[in-house]
Amino acid sequence: MARDYYDILGVSRDAGQEDLKQAYRRLARKYHPDVNKEAGAEERFKEINRAYEVLSDPETRARYDRFGEAGVSGAAAGYGDMGDMGGFADIFESIFSGFGGVGAGTSRRRTGPSRGDDLRFDLKLEFREAIFGGEKQIRITHLETCTTCNGSGAKPGTKPRTCGTCGGAGQVRRATRTPFGSFTQVSVCPTCNGKGQVIEDKCETCGGNGQAQVTKKLKITIPAGVDTGTRLRVSNEGDAGQQGGPAGDLYVYLFVQEDPEFRREGINILSEVKISYLQAILGSRLMVNTVDGEVELTIPPGTQPNTVLTLENHGVPRLGNPVSRGDHLITVLLEIPTRISAEERELLEKLAKIRGDRIGKGGIEGFFGKVFGG
């Protein structure tokens, strides 16, 4: 008994076209004969193609839903007949373009210039470095074009020859007949590994790769206002390209270390300051730490616990516009003494009487509760 086409693709019976397409891409890549050499993979691949051919067409899908396999016998074209398959041919070609594509029209030369790979470098910054920016020196290792052979991979005085297997195309084609039609498979040339050239006398410096690993120092400019997750791009500092292609880029990912005193919230900086109950009642002026150094902070009379006071323009510069800065927000914490002298107690009790506060049972703590809204 034939397997259910929905089960073959691993989708529900109400799956939409996008769900079908995604399932097909995933399974076709997994079971393609060039990728999967296990026994039964080719038959599984044929099942997947048959199921997608039927279900991707609304008309044949409707017949299949009503009559099953009997309703679509002979309806599918088979994956060798790309001319009548419309969108199916497009998706099939796009899926396998990574290893050669399918059909006579999909052959692509792999020779010629190719861009180098991009590289990633993780960089830790101190809290203040992220706020104000500056320069950092880093050490990276990347591939550069071999200076001995100028990237050809061949020993100086010699040059690569055209691959005799693929004729310089970098790909070979193999025609296979299946129950579903003729299948032309294009794959990377096994002789030259897709380069189209064979190096007989390899460069002694790079071993025929045309590239060599080099460790170098770079100065990175850190803009003011960066944060964890900010990514900086350094052009052309990735791996060198091949066959004269451009180099890739270096991407520097920033990670900002925590500060024991300050926290960051967007472009604002947060910190705390402890004051005495007398400073809270009478008001005060005191020096507090900011990223710019010590700054005078005014404590208004009657300041309540957890009041947030603002020092404008002492926060983080706005990334891309360092003239504009956030604020420094300071949370006021109140220090209530656990012990006081007899003289202090006497004075506080006199003050409580003047205010008309009863402090009998709660003692002087009850007085503080009244004063600070407790």
Curated annotation (Swiss-Prot):
First and last residues of every CXXCXGXG motif repeat: 146-153, 163-170, 189-196, 203-210
A cellular component term, taken from the record's GO annotations: cytoplasm
Organism: Cyanothece sp. (strain PCC 7425 / ATCC 29141)
Cofactors demanded by this protein: Zn(2+)
Family per similarity comment: Belongs to the DnaJ family.
Residue ranges of domain J in the record: 4-68
InterPro entries membership: DnaJ, DnaJ_C, DnaJ_domain, DnaJ_domain_CS, HSP40/DnaJ_pept-bd, HSP_DnaJ_Cys-rich_dom, HSP_DnaJ_Cys-rich_dom_sf, J_dom_sf
Keywords on record: Chaperone, Cytoplasm, DNA replication, Metal-binding, Repeat, Stress response, Zinc, Zinc-finger
SMART domains recorded: DnaJ
Subunit structure: Homodimer.
Role summary: Participates actively in the response to hyperosmotic and heat shock by preventing the aggregation of stress-denatured proteins and by disaggregating proteins, also in an autonomous, DnaK-independent fashion. Unfolded proteins bind initially to DnaJ; upon interaction with the DnaJ-bound protein, DnaK hydrolyzes its bound ATP, resulting in the formation of a stable complex. GrpE releases ADP from DnaK; ATP binding to DnaK triggers the release of the substrate protein, thus completing the reaction cycle.
NCBIfam families named among the record's database cross-references: DnaJ_bact, PRK10767.1, PRK14293.1
Name assigned to this protein: Chaperone protein DnaJ
